[in-house]
Amino acid sequence: MKPTLRLLTAFLFVQPLVLAQQAPQSVPNAVSVAGAATQPVSGGPINIGSRRELFIDRLLIERLDNASLKLHEPTSGGVVIRIDKPWEGPGNFGMSVIELGGRLLMYYRGWSLSDPKDQNGMACVAESRDGGVTWTKPALNLVAKPEWPDNNVIATEDGVPRFAFPCAPWVDTRPGVPATERVKMIESMPVSGEKHTAMRDPVGPKRLVFWASSDGVTFRKLAPQPEFVSDLRNSFDGGNTMFWSEAEQQYVLYYRFWDVSAKAPSADVDRLGGRGYRSMARTTSKDLMVWTKPVPMSYGNTPREQFYINNTQPYFRAPHLYLAPAARFMEGRRAITLEQGASAGLVNAIGSAKIDWTRDCSDAVLLTSRAGATAYDRTFMETFIRPGPGYGNWTSRSNYPLTGILSAGEQQIQFFVSRHYLQKSWHVERLLLRTDGFASVSVPWAGGEMVTKPVSFTGKSLEINYRTGAPGFVRVEIQNSSGNPIPGFALADCPEVIGDEITRIVAWKQGTDVSRLAGQPVRLRFVMKDADLFAMQFR
């Protein structure tokens, strides 16, 4: 591939924002970010307050005996949109899904690949009015083109379809944001003035430009214009996410860059020259105007991998927890032959660019982080969203999640994934998962237990999200910080909890009231059999 061709990397976008620089912000363990569970340097209890805690990492866990942390894969909710418009085509790509005004809006790039001069496509929108089950493409006609009747292309106020690379609209939830600026979007521009396209990533610093909308379809530039310039190599080439953090009380931006501090295998070579990893940096702002110095995210003591899109976002039921269903790109890892790719209808050229789109494969993994942290936790290295059967799922840059984890009712959550990239069979699939059910403390039939580190809490009762088999159970003992049962809350005082419930209040012989223990350092001992514990919360 020619050096100027960066292989469409930027079509996944997540909530981003822009910055001017201020001192770097790093939140060590000693700092208790509002809404975040942190371990004081003094070794005192972890203050979880009344927040819901999911078992997506080991922060709260002291000991696992015949128990393990288990990642749970989503199930398919069916295909929700396909290529069916003349302005769409094999270059379609999923961006983000938001909830606005009682409906869901899904943003995706429409790119027919029929015009050699068009190296970006354009941002389109679909909508669902039944909670994500069925989707339609509204006839917006914001862009006046006779060959695009009843088109669903989003645009500027003057009808220009300039958005597509990269832009992922997101809802700004900061209190006091004007209704006219509730939906925001960014685009990446080289400082040099060169055009940043899906097929060309100019060398040099890049900046983000902010747009806003009241309805999620017509956008105008913010004024005054926030701006963040990054000189990290290959900044913003897809995979940018941004949101207002309720836990941190500030805007947080995660954006992609090329990390040359760690040398990747020879197959993973930057098209701009040099070996490195597609990675993420984090920066924050109170007002969108002044931003902290970007800090590259770390990944703990785990093997480095290529992350095309990060999709980092607060979990709506526990906003201090940041979940990132990230697109993992296995560059140079071939699963199918050229002939098999051709049989799937794979496009082998974009304009004059001849590319072997069968040489790579992709899936999605679950990265997690917490408010204020500059590291991703990689408790789970295995695949979260699998490619699945069929040659079409084993081509380069397929299986990339869209930004957005949303409710699908009390029992389930939903998110979406882009399949069959650069094929006429491209589509977006709806995925479903148990509410809070990304991972669990899982115990087999033989039985086992999990004991937490010392924690302090506020509230009157302990709520759990759990499931058991017919012979299974969950029982809870509350201990003092030394590990001794507190009278009235010993294991023998807790009847077996049996069933499958998103919400269950734990009871002991004396009842459910735990308020006399609030504010004290305690340990929780969960003794289980044939059971999964997904989350807990004091309320």
Can you say where each PLM-predicted feature lies in the sequence?
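Sec-dependent signal peptide recognition
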Residues: 2-10
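Hydrophobic h-region of N-terminal signal peptides that target proteins for export
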Residues: 11-19
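Carbohydrate-active catalytic/glycan-binding domains of CAZyme proteins
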Residues: 22-539
